[in-house]
Amino acid sequence: MRLAFFVKDVATEIDEYATTRLARAALQRGHEVWYVGAEDVELGESDGQLVARAHAAEFTKGDTLESFMRRIKERDIERIVMDDLDALFLRNESVDDLQERPWASPLGVVFGQMLEARGVTVVNDPKSLIRAASKLYLEEFPEKIRPRSLVTRDPEAIKRFVGTVGRSVVKPLYGGRGRNVFMIEDETEANLAQMTEAVLQDGYAIVQEFVEGGEDGDARIFLLEGKILERDGKLAAFRRVPTGTDLRANISVGGRSVPLDIGEVERGVIDAMSEKLVADGMFFVGIDVIGDKVVEINAESTGGIQSVEWLYEIDVCPTVIEALERRTGSKP
């Protein structure tokens, strides 16, 4: 299988990313692997082919993830014809580019749709990823598995919503890594105007009714083709616990990961989501769950696989690559 990982910028990739582990798994199964950054693609004026200035990946005996990634960056750039790929794995985070490089933000789904039309297997499905990259995507799932919410740019509407439902969380509709996420106790919150203003600087806000138990963190569960990702009987899921008084459990803002036992409640949530995720082509996603409610769907470059590896001493990435092999009809 000729596989390329489409990332934000090859130069900023690091060994701890889930993408690094996915690339390692693909190489260890005998596949050809390339890294392509958002600014590395060209459309040939004569033949109309999509061409990329790509970095070849090679995992050798004795490599650590750090040395593996270092050598990817050090290798000479090679030109590859992306039309000839078997699969393209979209691992860029368009939300990260919205502020500093807005021109780069949509390129994953744009190039992905072009290549899909040319016969390349693209995951996650770029046509659906346009919606799924937004927190609005959660609103397409059954009401019973999501908190009450409001999407708006009206500060007064936010205040009215909080006055109706009480304790709430407000965050940017397009955002991640815990940036500009605030807890609002009630509509009389002293800093409500400042918090709302900070969130609305990033565009639309989404306000969610606070889910009881959220102060203790959330569960990050990885789903592959609508089912819990697992390897050798171990499930790819963990609990993210916030530190101190910070409600955000994101690892990127200091949250810590602890083992999680998947119970009937979590399985019921997944069952309610599975059919739609599969229909939408959401091959590999992470969901954040509190109690019986999903508070976020991470459909674009979902991270945290390293926590699964550390907690359970298992590499689940080969299971992801095996599923991709089945999709492309490739053999290891």
Residue ranges and their predicted role:
Residues 6-7, 260-332:
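ATP-dependent carboxylate activation and anion-phosphoryl transfer catalytic cores
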Residues 168-170, 205-208, 281-286:
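A short linear hydrophobic-aromatic micro-motif
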Residues 92-95, 173-175, 302:
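Short glycine-rich anion-binding loops that position phosphate/pyrophosphate groups of nucleotides
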Residues 27, 116, 162-163, 278:
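Anion (oxyanion) recognition and catalysis
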Residues 11-28, 34-148:
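Conserved N-proximal alpha/beta basic substrate-recognition cap immediately N-terminal to
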Residues 18-20, 156, 163-166, 177-267, ...:
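Phosphate-binding site of ATP-dependent enzymes
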Residues 143-166:
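Rossmann-like NAD(P)H-binding beta-loop-alpha module
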Residues 1-4:
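Extreme N-terminal starter segment of soluble prokaryotic enzymes
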